[in-house]
Every structure is written in structure tokens, then in C-alpha cells.
């Protein structure tokens, strides 16, 4: 077995299979679920990109993802559950487009924690790239706000980025602690030490 991750997706799909008496059709349903979720997330990201910049840029963004063989090949994969890679990016983009809305920011903080937490429980692969990519839009906003000498906006963007980064790291560490606790049979330190075996 592969013990260096928790494998939430395997547990989730396994429970559903048992609930439906391991119907042979369930595998196709799970594949389609992952593909549809990825399409929804990428379409929403493209909509937000269009909202932030322009419709043409949003369309190009979507076509680029849609024609990527790498994205298409993993869309239905039950191990990668690829849509979880892009949810943190979507969250930060939504915040970037609605920075002044306090309720949106608060919802984003909570959502970011769970998005990263769930992604890490499914697998730690690419998590650094995902987190860096998530902050790209806000980082660009901060650079523009500083260039425009808009101190209030700069402070808000910086504060928002710091909080989002902090809750994302919290999601990562909570997932590691949960995984280590299980792997170490209640001994977190032992679970962390043995996490690579």
C-alpha cells in the first residue's frame, strides 16, 4: 500500500461503493463526478478571470485548460481528484475580484482552510505549486496597488494575502497531524517520523 498519504478520496469512493452494493456502474459515476467537478471549477475560474480582466482573456484561459492533454488525461482520475488542485486558486481569485466585501473575505478564509485540508488528505502532491499559484492574483493586485500608491488598498490586499496564506498552512498542518496520529496509532511524533514508509 501507499502509506505516505491519508487517501481521503479512496475512503470516500469506497464508502459510496459499499453503500450502493459495489455496483459496477459506480466506477463510471465516480470518473464522471471528478471530470464534471473539474470542468465546473475551471469554468468558474475562467469566468472570474474574465470578470477581472476581460472576456477574451477568460476565454483564452478556459481554452488553454480545455486543450491541455495533461489536464484532460487526469480529469477522471480517482487518485488525483484533479479538481481539488484548482479550488484554492478559485478561492483567491474570487477574493481578488471582491476584495472590499468583508463577508466574502471571511468565507474565503474558512473555505481556504478546508480546500487545502481536503487536498492534503487526498494527497500532498503539488501542494507548494498550488499554494503559490493561488496567491498569484493577489500578489499582482498588491504590486499594482503599490505602484498606484494606494496605501489603504495595499494594506487590505497584504492583510488578506497573509490571512489566506496562514489558514492554508493551517489546513496543511492539520492534515499532517491527523494523518500522523492515525499512522502512529495515536503517537503523532512517531507517525510523522514514519510518514515516508
Annotated model-derived regions:
Residues 161-197:
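Membrane-lumen/periplasm interface segments of specific transmembrane helices
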Residues 33-41, 79-91, 131:
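Membrane-embedded alpha-helical segments of multi-pass membrane proteins
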Residues 1-24:
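Short hydrophobic/aromatic helix or loop-helix immediately within or flanking a transmembrane segment
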Residues 90-107, 143-144:
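Membrane-interface transmembrane helices that cradle and orient dolichyl/undecaprenyl
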Residues 29-58:
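Transmembrane-helix motifs of polytopic, lipid-linked glycan transferases
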Residues 107-126, 130, 164-166:
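Membrane-interface alpha helices of multi-pass inner-membrane proteins
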Residues 23-29, 61-85, 116-117, 121:
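Aromatic- and kink-enriched transmembrane "portal" helix at the membrane-lumen/periplasm boundary
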Residues 130-169:
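Perimembrane helix-loop-helix junctions
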Amino acid at each position: 500500500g501507499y502509506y505516505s498519504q491519508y487517501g481521503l478520496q479512496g475512503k470516500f469512493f469506497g464508502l459510496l461503493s459499499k453503500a450502493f452494493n459495489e455496483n459496477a456502474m459506480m466506477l463510471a459515476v465516480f470518473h464522471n463526478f471528478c471530470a464534471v467537478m473539474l470542468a465546473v471549477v475551471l469554468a468558474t475560474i475562467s469566468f472570474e478571470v474574465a470578470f477581472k480582466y476581460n472576456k477574451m482573456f477568460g476565454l483564452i484561459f478556459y481554452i488553454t485548460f480545455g486543450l491541455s492533454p495533461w489536464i484532460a488525461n487526469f480529469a477522471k482520475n480517482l487518485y488525483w481528484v484533479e479538481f481539488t488542485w484548482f479550488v484554492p486558486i478559485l478561492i483567491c481569485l474570487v477574493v481578488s475580484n471582491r476584495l472590499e466585501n468583508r463577508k466574502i473575505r471571511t468565507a474565503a478564509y474558512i473555505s481556504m482552510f478546508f480546500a487545502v485540508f481536503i487536498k492534503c488528505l487526498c494527497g500532498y502532491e503539488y501542494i507548494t505549486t498550488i499554494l503559490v499559484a493561488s496567491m498569484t492574483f493577489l500578489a499582482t493586485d498588491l504590486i499594482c496597488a503599490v505602484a498606484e500608491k494606494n496605501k489603504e488598498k495595499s494594506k487590505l490586499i497584504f492583510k488578506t494575502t497573509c490571512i489566506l496564506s496562514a489558514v492554508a498552512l493551517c489546513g496543511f498542518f492539520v492534515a499532517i497531524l491527523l494523518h500522523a496520529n492515525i499512522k502512529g496509532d495515536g503517537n503523532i511524533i512517531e507517525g510523522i517520523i514514519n510518514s515516508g514508509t
